[in-house]
Amino acid sequence: MKRIGVFGGAFDPPHVAHAALVKAALAELQLDELRVVPTGEAWHKTRTLSPAPHRLAMAQLAFAELPHVVVDPRELERVGPSYTVDTLREFKALWPTAEFFLILGEDQAQALPSWHDWQEILQLAIICVATRACSTGAGAKFDLETTHKSRFRRLLMPALNVSATDIRARFAAHLSVADMVFEPVARYIAHHHLYQTA
């Protein structure tokens, strides 16, 4: 049975912790393939995201060298709000016999009951909860994980405390982002003047 990981996110920008998590997921979950899915019109984001073509290009640059990783643009091409369940349904239709692993951070996993058709998400994929470095209460079980034990597993995430929010702030302040984003991504951001305040 094919094992496919699904890792969604804004990737605004993608950074070294994203890549480390992808590598950890491929190894620990023994995945045949991992689909990196940049978020489309995210219903839960309060911040305006960078334009889709930029986020797609940065994701392609960030994950280009990783084997078995495919950057999947389907959510960016979707019209209207982008829901994870729709993406999983599409994947299930493409690979009906595959086993799917949805990779989420702890904060996302705890918010899962607020997601569109979240019960179906639990049927379509195993939820792999990545514990962030230095997170408060890291590793503590939450209600849904306790009540749906068979649909959850923990994914040990490398201890890299890097955030896209910090990276955007550093670009805006013209500070170094060395060791936070890959050089091709940093060059792309600089070339397109992303994250610059007016």
UniProtKB/Swiss-Prot annotation:
Enzyme Commission identifier(s): 2.7.7.18
Gene3D superfamilies per UniProt: HUPs
Keyword rRNA-binding assigned: no
One of the GO BP terms on file: NAD biosynthetic process
Protein's pathway: Cofactor biosynthesis; NAD(+) biosynthesis; deamido-NAD(+) from nicotinate D-ribonucleotide: step 1/1
Catalytic activity: nicotinate beta-D-ribonucleotide + ATP + H(+) = deamido-NAD(+) + diphosphate
SS bonds (residue pairs): none
Keyword annotations: ATP-binding, NAD, Nucleotide-binding, Nucleotidyltransferase, Pyridine nucleotide biosynthesis, Transferase
Main enzyme class: transferase
A GO term for molecular function: ATP binding
Keyword Nucleotide-binding: yes
Protein family according to the UniProt entry: Belongs to the NadD family.
HAMAP family (alphabetical): NaMN_adenylyltr
Function as written in the Swiss-Prot or TrEMBL entry: Catalyzes the reversible adenylation of nicotinate mononucleotide (NaMN) to nicotinic acid adenine dinucleotide (NaAD).
PANTHER family associated with the record: NICOTINATE-NUCLEOTIDE ADENYLYLTRANSFERASE-RELATED (PTHR39321), PHOSPHOPANTETHEINE ADENYLYLTRANSFERASE (PTHR39321:SF3)
Identification of the protein by name: Probable nicotinate-nucleotide adenylyltransferase
Organism ancestry: Bacteria, Pseudomonadati, Pseudomonadota, Betaproteobacteria, Burkholderiales
